[in-house]
Amino acid sequence: MKIQSNVIKIIIVISLLIGVGALYLLLSLRTPEKPLAGQVNIYEDNVKIGGDFELIDQNGEIFNSDKLKGNLSLIYFGFTSCPDICPTSLNKMTEIVEILNKHKIDILPVFITIDPKRDTPIALKEYLKHFHPKFIGLTGNEQQIKDVTDKFKVFYARVHGDDDDPNYMLDHSSFTYLIDANGKYLKHFYLDSSPKEMMEFLRNE
């Protein structure tokens, strides 16, 4: 009887472990983790990416999406206080522009802020001095930025600091969008995409 009792206890424990494991798996599948910078995915099937927008450039002038037409464009969403991801991506864009210019191909690099509170036209102008001189920096009010980020499926959220903290930080997706000469979305490149990968795609276009 003692052996039978021990067997029953073992069976109960195993059943409980299986139940807990199944519950954990179910919750994991139903509750996605908060995306980290550069890890958000864009599902292109039946999803329109891009669209018309009107913002303010680093010179304080109105800049709308029609001004992208006529040449290829690369668009990146970030903020000037970004410590590493944004500078890395903008440096890659600078490299791409320089390579294409050597082959007599014009491409316009565009940086759209997700932090309009701090990224004024003056702040953008100063920041973009560190990258290719062709860079266009765009800002606007919070609603304008929300509208354009929604159209490009951009994730961003405050992760450190509150409204009173001037040094708050943002987490955001890190894609570089390739726009064709008609102002239409062609493809997006990930944070870890190399300039070589981008060039290979452009050569095939």
From Swiss-Prot:
- Binding of Cu cation occurs at C82, C86, H172
* Disulphide-bonded residues: none
> What sections of the protein cross the membrane?
none
Q: Which Pfam families match?
A: SCO1-SenC
Alphabetized UniProt keyword annotations: Copper, Metal-binding
What are this entry's molecular-function GO terms? metal ion binding
Tell me which family the UniProt entry assigns to this protein: Belongs to the SCO1/2 family.
Q: Which PANTHER family match?
A: ELECTRON TRANSPORT PROTIN SCO1/SENC FAMILY MEMBER (PTHR12151), LINALOOL DEHYDRATASE_ISOMERASE DOMAIN-CONTAINING PROTEIN (PTHR12151:SF25)
UniProt-recorded name of the protein: SCO2-like protein RC0895
| Species annotation | Rickettsia conorii (strain ATCC VR-613 / Malish 7)
